[in-house]
Amino acid sequence: MNNVFVKGLFFFLLLFGFFLKASENPNATLNPSKENVSVEEQKRFGGVLVFARGADGSSMDPALVTDGESYVATGNIYDTLVQFKYGTTEIEPALATSWEISPDGLVYTFHLRKGVYFHQTKYWNKKVEFSAKDVLFSFERQMHKTKRYYSPGAKSYKYWEGMGMSHIIKSIEALDDYTIRFTLNGPEAPFLANLGMDFLSILSKDYADYLAQNNKKDELAKKPVGTGPFKFFLWNKDEKIILLKNQDYWGPKAYLDKVVVRTIPNPSTRALALRTGEIMLMTGPNLNEVEQLEKVPNIVVDKSAGLLASWLSLNTQKKYFNNPLVRLAINHAINVDDYIKVLYEGFAQKMVNPFPPTIWGYNYNIKPYEYDLKKAKELLKQAGYPNGFKTTIFTTATRNPKGAVFIQASLAKIGIDVKIEVYEWGAYLKRTGLGEHEMAFAGWMADIADPDNFLYTLWSKQAASAIPTQNGSFYKSDAFSDLLLKAKRVSDQKEREALYLKAQEIIHKDAPYVPLAYPYSVVPHLSKVKGYKTTGVNVNRFFKVYLEK
């Protein structure tokens, strides 16, 4: 999930291959009766949570976006066939109650949950039950160009294309109203976990058809109708989003009556709003303010090793950066330890490989590029640029301006003159997705706990060809990508791990990026806010959050 942490989306899962069949009776635990709710738990219900983040989302259609800010809303509005248990990396049933996988790994059959209804809102008051036709619509609009829904060329299904889903899935069939069958072109080890990703959320076909018939297709991305624990109420762009509790949710009802998601670009302003009680929970604090926030009696700061990575993309298709010697020189010219001190106040681990060590398959034998200005200058000389060159770095006003200044100063020491170009968030995502940059900051939050989610989605040649791309380095190594494809087709985790270990060696040698940090998740909130978790795959889900009375 891009967010400069792209999610999008993402988060850890204990290999899909262990889940050949889910529980046949998940309703027993997913829908506890009122008699089973303790008096203490009943006290949790009610109240309004005010949550603040630094930037607004770009769409209410989860298939169109990769940025984590958009998923803050859509992740609470929509459901997927399977989901990740809150705060963990474990897969559990969602809109599918159970599934079977054929012995050859090519056929997945899902049994859908009955009695689930799409939201009724002020703009859509029809009571419609979820069924197989909605799954078909949600997938086929991304899979087939003839069923794209939006006007041709108007919108792009970035995640679908970047992950090569049309090459993975051969066909999708509705066997009846409550049974869906996926047939794959070949074994795909992460497939089950991928079905829990936000871009594969299930939308209402009836609602989409209604909008199409009334020439309002664009409203699908502005006024969502899902089956999730919260319903959409209001979106004032760059100001706030309001979500209301879905009283008819198929699973345990949310504790909160309402969630207000505010956009406050300045982190210090967010922190002040937290101090005064104007907001209750915030993301992206100024890390040099965390210590002071922890001293405030009614504020708690949750910290955890996250599933995040942050780096500097070097566009390998641009002049200078198409030379691996230049890319290595840049890596040796940047003191990453100092970068982490300046940017993260120590709330991060030094990045070495494309994904964090909290995911299996991490190559611990690879050592970071050492900070060595003499070596960096020598590499530039070997590349044919003894006096350096001029280039640019893309950043955003709210995301990483301090980091851009640090990189600019570092590269100046080896003769590289860097101009900083600042863009608003939406323009930044568009320009980097099209490859207009030479250098640009990027990041990723794991969508699933599988190396494939980082390596293939962000670094494969296939991803580089899907424009707009998540592969901001436009890295197109055949040797690297071939290993990733082989790993997809193997079900044994040890065999996959061996392939990923080799792939990490190749990308380290090619240096298409500057590894910077594995940031920690740091979330300040009022002490009365309970149940929010910074761990696991699905962050910023509010159905388990409550206000202590």
Predicted regions and their residues:
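Ligand-site clamp/hinge motif
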Residues: 215-221, 244-292, 417-419
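Alpha-helical secondary-structure segments
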Residues: 50, 131-137, 177-183, 228-229, ...
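Aromatic- and charge-enriched surface segment that lines or borders ligand/interaction sites
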Residues: 97-148, 181, 273
